[in-house]
Amino acid sequence: SVGFKAGVKDYKLTYYTPAYQTKDTDILAAFRVSPQPGVPPEEAGAAVAAESSTGTWTTVWTDGLTSLDRYKGRCYYIEPVAGEENQYIAYVAYPLDLFEEGSVTNMFTSIVGNVFGFKALRALRLEDLRIPTAYVKTFQGPPHGIQVERDKLNKYGRPLLGCTIKPKLGLSAKNYGRAVYECLRGGLDFTKDDENVNSQPFMRWRDRFVFCAEALYKAQAETGEIKGHYLNATAGTCEEMNKRAVFARELGVPIIMHDYLTGGFTANTSLAHYCRDNGLLLHIHRAMHAVIDRQKNHGIHFRVLAKALRMSGGDHIHSGTVVGKLEGEREITLGFVDLLRDDYIEKDRDRGIYFTQDWVSLPGVLPVASGGIHVWHMPALTEIFGDDSVLQFGGGTLGHPWGNAPGGVANRVALEACVQARNEGRDLAREGNEIIREASK
């Protein structure tokens, strides 16, 4: 007779293990599970653990050729979500051997690759991941990190200022370069290609790179400060992306840019390695993130995408504003901002942090506040984000009634006034408007 019984069996018999003690080397995941009516939460949690690790819908004889106990994911704890009906947080532990070293792509393919279409679930959201230090050490991470960036730019003790060039599509390369020059000349540290500026018929990438580099050097010579423009190297193929990065390096510019979700983690990690080897800073835009993270009960929370970016590599990443035109709750946003910047972050459920995360020596990433912010937000932004951040004003610079350079001046003056007021112990939340008014005289 055959040594196993064929047929369908409940996942929870194998994959729900409440007695399991998690290991320091396990990757831990917190899933928000919404089971279909009639499906018990233990079965739903176990199904997630199974389908994202070793399981399939039936017993197979080849299970006997390996040690499931060594390789299976385990749902080790389930708790109901307060205030929600039929929603649970299922905690799953994955043995480290299930994942390829240094590959965010493989990590996501395993953990979220297949399980989200699962029939037994009405919806599923990955809320957080604990990346064990043993796995963290297989990643290069950000090309340079916060301290090295400050040293390269020679800018300390304040947030950095950026601006996205608008209109984002339709300008010729020459006019685009002119706008870059005006903003940098006015006092900004950086200007930025919009995420969808790649290489279109009205402005090919090489022309844009050349005119922006010229603008950069002219502004640098006139202000005596180091300036940067995020040259978007995102392209249709990895080879083309690399070609653009190489050309940027030849021009001697300090920073380039990539859309990491649309470009993909594999391309992004390659680019991050190139940037470290060649002394380029890497600005990351999160285009497409809301497709994945906006639904409260389905998808992947942005804090997971932020952690993945820190592993894959980037020196800046857009992280919401708390005060502008795009969604983002203050405590939750500050939670993942700390996950980007700090070496060690304690578990804190009020800030959405489900696990203590130790990044060991992985460099930090500067959060970028961008989207519908303007000079009157400056006190709040300075207070919320602190010094290690990039504040980006697109329309908030180029929309200045006197033009781009005065827009840049206004932002720089407002920022320096806020930083000085904070250093003198003034209350930015209460006196913010007054501080800006005084500075603008």
From Swiss-Prot:
**Cofactor mode of binding and number, as noted:** Binds 1 Mg(2+) ion per subunit.
Q: Any idea which residues are catalytic in this one?
A: 166 (proton acceptor), 285 (proton acceptor)
Key words, A-Z:
Calvin cycle, Carbon dioxide fixation, Chloroplast, Disulfide bond, Lyase, Magnesium, Metal-binding, Methylation, Monooxygenase, Oxidoreductase, Photorespiration, Photosynthesis, Plastid
A Pfam family found in this protein is RuBisCO_large_N
Compartments (UniProt record): Plastid, Chloroplast
In its keyword annotation, does this UniProt entry include Cell membrane? no
Task: Report what the protein is called.
Answer: Ribulose bisphosphate carboxylase large chain
Q: Name one GO biological process term.
A: photorespiration
Task: Please give an example of a GO cellular component term from this record.
Answer: chloroplast
Where primarily located?
plastid
- The UniProt record gives the binding positions of substrate as 114, 164, 168, 286, 318, 370
| Name of the gene this protein is made from | rbcL
User: What are the required cofactors?
Assistant: Mg(2+)
